[in-house]
């Protein structure tokens, strides 16, 4: 299914109930989950404490029928929720209409149990395109650059020095990976 899968939370819950009753599998189109940098990050990451995300782009009139949260930030919300396995305690949201009649810049702060925080900013009004995620945890830092397909890891060693490791990934066909995952899920070979 394309995002947003429904126009309201109640419709989404209803669709989920219908799918479960009919034993129908559906998957929401979140391509970034199939980004090799995110997959590598998930294999390396333990107990994130703070996540900072920026998804900024130059104005493009192609997507002005939807606000910046549903157009851009939705990808980052999905990734953050897949990285943090804790209950949400509080969500704070701020957004502004700048050029269009819908929200063009938004900031969301999600507070989880155990003082884990994610701060997400999305804007479709910028002088440059930027898509970065920074993850802070005890004795380590990860940085994902979605545009260059690069993951960097900074780890504190036992002697209090730091080691930086970079992982560069080739551009991959995330849509193809997502479709393969869906097919394998339907055949019971993978979990979606």
What do these predicted ranges mean?
Residues 1-30:
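Beta-strand-loop-alpha-helix segment that lines the small-molecule cofactor/substrate pocket
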Residues 5, 30-34, 47, 54-57, ...:
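Short, flexible active-site-adjacent loop segments at beta-strand->alpha-helix junctions, enriched
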Residues 8, 69, 73, 175:
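Short, conserved glycine- and acidic-residue-centered signature motifs
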Residues 12, 34-38, 76-77, 172-180:
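A general structural signal for well-ordered alpha-helical segments in protein cores
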Residues 25, 32-99:
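Predominantly a Rossmann-like dinucleotide-binding segment in NAD(P)-dependent oxidoreductases
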Residues 64-70, 164-173:
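A short glycine-threonine-serine/GTX helix/turn-capping micro-motif
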Residues 77-150, 176-190:
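Contiguous beta-strand/loop segments that form the cofactor/metal-binding neighborhood of enzyme cores
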């Amino acid at each position: 299914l394309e995002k947003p899968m429904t126009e309201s939370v109640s419709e989404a819950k209803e669709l989920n109930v219908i799918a479960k009753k009919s034993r129908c599998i559906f998957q929401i189109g979140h391509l970034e989950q199939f980004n090799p940098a995110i997959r590598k990050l998930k294999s390396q990451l333990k107990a994130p404490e703070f996540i900072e995300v920026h998804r900024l782009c130059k104005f493009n009139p192609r997507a002005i029928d939807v606000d910046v949260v549903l157009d851009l930030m939705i990808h980052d919300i999905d990734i953050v929720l897949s990285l943090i396995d804790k209950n949400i305690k509080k969500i704070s949201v701020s957004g502004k209409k700048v050029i269009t009649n819908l929200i063009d810049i938004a900031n969301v702060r999600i507070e989880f149990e155990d003082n884990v925080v994610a701060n997400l900013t999305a804007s479709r009004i910028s002088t440059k395109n930027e898509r970065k995620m920074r993850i802070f945890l005890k004795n380590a830092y990860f940085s994902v650059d979605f545009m260059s397909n690069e993951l960097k890891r900074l780890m504190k060693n036992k002697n209090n020095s730091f080691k930086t490791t970079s992982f560069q990934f080739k551009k991959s066909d995330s849509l193809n990976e997502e479709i393969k995952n869906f097919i394998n899920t339907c055949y019971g070979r993978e979990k979606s």
